[in-house]
Amino acid sequence: YHTYRIPAIVRATDGSLLAFAEGRKAGQGDSGDIDLLLRRSTDGGATWNQPQLLWDDGPNTCGNPCPVVDRTTGRIHLLMTRNLGTDHEAEIIAQTSTESRRVWTMTSDDHGVTWSAPRELTASVKAPDWTWYATGPGGAIRLRNGTLLVPATHAAQARRREVQGKYD
């Protein structure tokens, strides 16, 4: 990878540290072939495993990792976004891109060793008039009532940006 960006780190219920980041293949830009990566440490960060590829969608952009650990169940939720690698932020916001930015999740029930396949959440978290959506940066939190509060930004009707957080 040429560049690593948008880091996020959480501690699993077994004490493992999980560090997520985008792996940008062609350069520092925010579009293109971008994969989602994970490195784990089981010794408090003294050593780290080799990067684990969590999501490679070919030439497309997979990123904005936003993890949260449910301390009650131990499940780790990873929220993220995906768009065509040929679509750029300004085009997505202006609705001149080929596709829109979409929202996805993956989960792990074994402290980040293995992960579910990506599952799309766009319809439940992104309003129809929102053109842009980005999870994070950083991590989310679990409220006492079990709600996962995920930081995110969006642009609505190609004019304004707002902050939003929601995920059940």
Predicted segments — roles?
Residues Y1-D168:
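Asp-box/BNR beta-propeller blade signature and adjacent active/binding-site loops
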